[in-house]
From Swiss-Prot:
InterPro entries: Ntn_hydrolases_N, Pept_T1A_Psome_bsu_arc, Pept_T1A_subB, Proteasome_bsu_CS, Proteasome_sua/b, Proteasome_suB-type
Regulation: The formation of the proteasomal ATPase PAN-20S proteasome complex, via the docking of the C-termini of PAN into the intersubunit pockets in the alpha-rings, triggers opening of the gate for substrate entry. Interconversion between the open-gate and close-gate conformations leads to a dynamic regulation of the 20S proteasome proteolysis activity.
Self-association state and partner proteins as the record states: The 20S proteasome core is composed of 14 alpha and 14 beta subunits that assemble into four stacked heptameric rings, resulting in a barrel-shaped structure. The two inner rings, each composed of seven catalytic beta subunits, are sandwiched by two outer rings, each composed of seven alpha subunits. The catalytic chamber with the active sites is on the inside of the barrel. Has a gated structure, the ends of the cylinder being occluded by the N-termini of the alpha-subunits. Is capped at one or both ends by the proteasome regulatory ATPase, PAN.
Function, in words: Component of the proteasome core, a large protease complex with broad specificity involved in protein degradation.
Pfam families: Proteasome (PF00227)
Keyword terms, alphabetized: Autocatalytic cleavage, Cytoplasm, Hydrolase, Protease, Proteasome, Threonine protease, Zymogen
Gene: psmB1
Protein's name in the database: Proteasome subunit beta 1
GO biological process: proteasomal protein catabolic process
UniProt family annotation: Belongs to the peptidase T1B family.
Naturally occurring in which organism (per UniProt): Pyrobaculum islandicum (strain DSM 4184 / JCM 9189 / GEO3)
Catalytic activity: Cleavage of peptide bonds with very broad specificity
Presence of the UniProt keyword Methyltransferase in the record: no
Length: 203
């Protein structure tokens, strides 16, 4: 039997009263070897939808590209933006269709539509769970303990951003295969935007 190798990543999603925040650390690792500290695990799909992921970078990028193309196609055909649940369901079908050789990625889908903000959690086979907050990846247990203690249903978008950064930092401090800086995707009625938080590690 070979030695188990972990693909490190930590991603967090928080639904606020006025939007959604997705966050992920930037380290790309193979086991305890760091390949890069500039990995992208947060992706803007359109101005109302974003995803964050934990797993293999290539699979994350492929899923983001597939979803972006399908959103563009829908908007051209129907002349309106798809709902968050509809795009999550589409991604679920795509992931389940690969169940014999699945994408090695857990996904957070976050966005805003006519019904308000949504956060949907997906496993590698495409199971869907809508929730108020979630954490994925090797640092998930560390991050979600902070979310459990701090989250409120009436949390504002600015408070959610701060909490997401704190949760990722908590994972980075203890999880040896998470690290680098933090990428954020913030989605509200004004659109979707990316932000970066640099972290200085003290050794």
């Amino acid at each position: 039997m070979g030695e188990e190798v972990q693909i490190g990543a930590t991603a967090v999603g928080i639904k606020a009263k006025d939007g959604v925040v997705l966050a992920a650390e930037k380290r790309v690792s193979y086991g305890f070897y760091t390949l890069s500290s500039a990995g992208k695990k947060v992706f803007i799909i359109n101005d109302k939808l974003a995803i964050a992921s934990a797993g293999i970078i290539a699979d994350m990028q492929t899923l983001a590209r597939i979803l972006k193309l399908n959103v563009m196609s829908y908007e051209l055909e129907v002349r309106k933006k798809p709902t968050v649940r509809a795009m999550a369901k589409l991604l679920s079908i795509i992931m389940f269709s690969r169940r014999l050789l699945p994408f090695y990625a857990e996904v957070l889908v976050g966005g805003v539509d006519e019904e308000g903000p949504h956060l949907i959690v997906m496993d590698p086979l495409g199971s869907l769970i809508e929730d108020n907050y979630a954490a994925l990846g090797t640092g998930a247990k560390l991050a979600v303990s902070l979310l459990d203690a701090t989250y409120r249903p009436d949390i504002s978008l600015q408070e959610a951003k701060k909490l997401a950064v704190q949760a990722i930092k908590a994972a980075i401090e203890r999880d040896p295969v998470s690290g680098g800086g933090i990428d954020l995707a913030v989605v509200d009625n004004n659109g979707a935007r990316e932000e970066e938080v640099k972290i200085q590690m003290v050794i």
